[in-house]
């Protein structure tokens, strides 16, 4: 079966849930393919989702870091979803709420069988904070590929941008092929084709391709 290209512009809001337990209640089971977006509260996660889907308000942006407290799910088609995870690491969030978010993130990454890939978004000027590394380590430990997306790349000159990209690639080289590193700018569109190509690949895991082939052959 030839790998089809997913039209990410067709993404539409599906549900919000406070944690993975509620996610299981609303979704048709742990099935299909999900790609998760995770990042610190000021990493530009909502802006990146809007830029990648070419929708200005798919994910709601806010000047107040820490606003996204829910797991928000967007549907691409009957088999595939994008999942916007709660922003983490915002200092002014109460400790109890922060711990609740961390628990929800950890449960999702470690227990969600349909998770095909995780995009960990980091401000290119402040990459690889402790919580970023924890997210990456959780995902790789569960054998889930990671795209470390260095956002707001338009904030740096080209030489400084590539210096940071290379430093992050070196720092994450211990994870081998499980982690890819790319610069990205929601404002300028820098890196968008590369990111969409990676997401498209994640949308076509071998098991889903085999399943769809079997269904087509049975018709």
Curated annotation (Swiss-Prot):
One Gene Ontology term from the biological process aspect of the record: division septum assembly
An annotated Gene Ontology molecular function: metal ion binding
Query: Is the keyword Cell division assigned to this protein?
Result: yes
Give start and end of each EngB-type G domain.
Answer: 31-205
Q: Which HAMAP family match?
A: GTPase_EngB
PANTHER family, sorted? ENGB-TYPE G DOMAIN-CONTAINING PROTEIN (PTHR11649:SF13), MSS1/TRME-RELATED GTP-BINDING PROTEIN (PTHR11649)
Role description: Necessary for normal cell division and for the maintenance of normal septation.
Q: What is this protein called?
A: Probable GTP-binding protein EngB
């Amino acid at each position: 079966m030839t790998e089809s290209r997913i039209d990410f512009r067709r993404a539409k809001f599906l549900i919000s849930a406070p944690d993975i337990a509620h996610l299981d209640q609303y979704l048709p089971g742990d099935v299909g393919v999900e790609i998760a977006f995770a990042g610190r509260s000021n990493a530009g996660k909502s802006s990146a989702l809007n830029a990648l889907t070419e929708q200005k308000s798919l994910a709601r942006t806010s000047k107040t870091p820490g606003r996204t407290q829910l797991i928000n799910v967007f549907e691409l088609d009957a088999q595939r979803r994008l999942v916007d995870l709660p922003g983490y690491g915002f200092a002014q969030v109460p400790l109890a709420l922060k711990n609740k978010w961390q628990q929800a993130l950890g449960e999702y990454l470690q227990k969600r069988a349909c998770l095909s890939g995780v995009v960990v978004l980091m401000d290119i000027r402040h990459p690889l904070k402790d919580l970023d590394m924890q997210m990456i380590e959780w995902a790789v430990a569960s054998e889930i590929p990671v795209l470390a997306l260095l956002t707001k790349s338009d904030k740096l000159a080209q030489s400084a941008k590539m210096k940071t990209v290379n430093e992050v690639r070196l720092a994450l080289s211990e994870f081998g092929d499980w982690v890819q590193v790319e610069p990205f700018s929601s404002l300028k569109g820098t890196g968008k084709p590369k990111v969409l190509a990676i997401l498209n690949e994640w949308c076509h895991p071998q098991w889903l391709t085999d399943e769809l082939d079997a269904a087509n052959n049975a018709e």
